[in-house]
């Protein structure tokens, strides 16, 4: 499933990998007075005077001596500090686990399991819901697994492609996977992580509105114009930008110039949805510019070169943010444009 989403990990470790650190950690917490027994369970008090709500102790061992999630998560922190000495450890889980991580982080700090300058952060995720507002399920009412979700999205895109007869049957499945990937990843990332959202397959696979396929279509449009220009024997000149001639061109340039700042801000706030909001804005600015501007039929060669350089820059930014793996041969991807009714490419 991760492979289908083109998601890869440098390291894959489970709770069992930290088990060996638990015995020494328990002894350390007891010997240094951080942990004490309360009704038979070994706990560490983590409440603070400034708390506005009750924060229960962090439970290290149950009364029967069994370890808990707190135990393994703390042992994992010790393992990571010993092996990697990270500047920051960031946990991604259901937002309903927030209290658990507050307890773990406070315990780790109190017991000096991490350095003072090591950041511990938690990103809580909301739930992906169906149109009824309840957690997304299969048609049969079971839990929707990622593999099945990917399959349903790909099938939806395949049907749209077949119905429009826009791609050769031999290419239809591959094209459906490309567009389906953009729909899933963009659809999820465009929502603020902590908020619940409705995953509407029909809306997310649409080529209209704030969707991955719409961004992909915009990339297709830029590639088509650039491809047409090169087919005529011309060579694209990088960095040939002139001062903007129209309001739409100026707006597009300003939007492109915000790229670095948006990415930096999204990184600092751990908010990828801000990048999605930006590329949607950029795609809209480009399409506005495109509809107002005769690009390839521009008689002033310097001005035309400027248009094309700007267009290429927009393409690179959109492609980088949507996903580099979506860079496909132009003659194949251009067929996607036909999936949008009334949207035949106007290359002049």
What is the role of each PLM region?
Residues 336, 347:
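Cationic, low-complexity basic patches in intrinsically disordered or flexible, solvent-exposed regions
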Residues 1-331, 348:
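Non-catalytic interaction-recognition regions
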Residues 340-343:
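Short, low-complexity intrinsically disordered segments enriched in A/P/G/S/L with frequent Arg
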């Amino acid at each position: 499933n991760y492979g289908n989403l083109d998601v890869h990990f440098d390291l894959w470790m489970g709770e069992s990998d930290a088990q060996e650190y638990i015995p020494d950690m328990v002894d350390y917490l007891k010997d240094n007075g951080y942990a004490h027994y309360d009704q038979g369970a070994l706990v560490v008090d983590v409440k603070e005077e400034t708390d506005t709500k009750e924060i229960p102790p962090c439970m290290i061992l149950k009364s029967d001596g069994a370890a808990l999630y707190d135990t393994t998560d703390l042992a994992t922190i010790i393992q990571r500090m010993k092996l990697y000495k990270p500047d920051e450890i960031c946990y991604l889980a259901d937002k309903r686990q927030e209290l658990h991580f507050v307890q773990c982080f406070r315990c780790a700090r109190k017991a000096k399991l991490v350095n003072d300058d090591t950041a511990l952060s938690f990103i809580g995720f909301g739930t992906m819901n169906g149109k009824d507002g309840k957690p997304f399920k299969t048609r049969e009412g079971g839990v929707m697994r990622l593999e099945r979700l990917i399959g349903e999205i790909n099938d939806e895109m395949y049907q749209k492609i077949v119905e429009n007869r826009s791609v050769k049957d031999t290419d239809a499945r591959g094209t459906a996977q490309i567009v389906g990937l953009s729909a899933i990843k963009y659809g999820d990332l465009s929502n603020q992580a902590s908020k619940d959202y409705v995953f509407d397959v029909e809306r997310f696979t649409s080529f209209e509105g704030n969707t991955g396929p719409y961004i992909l279509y915009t990339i297709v449009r830029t590639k088509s114009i650039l491809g047409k220009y090169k087919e005529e024997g011309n060579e694209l000149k990088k960095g040939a930008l002139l001062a903007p001639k129209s309001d739409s061109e100026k707006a597009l340039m300003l939007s492109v110039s915000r790229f670095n700042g948006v990415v930096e801000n999204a990184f600092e706030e751990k908010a990828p949805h801000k990048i999605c909001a930006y590329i949607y804005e950029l795609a809209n600015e480009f399409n506005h510019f495109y509809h107002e501007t005769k690009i390839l039929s521009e008689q002033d060669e310097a001005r035309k070169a400027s248009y094309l350089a700007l267009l290429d820059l927009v393409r690179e930014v959109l492609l980088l943010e949507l996903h580099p793996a979506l860079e496909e041969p132009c003659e194949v991807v251009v067929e996607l444009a036909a999936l949008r009714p009334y949207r035949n490419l106007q290359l002049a």
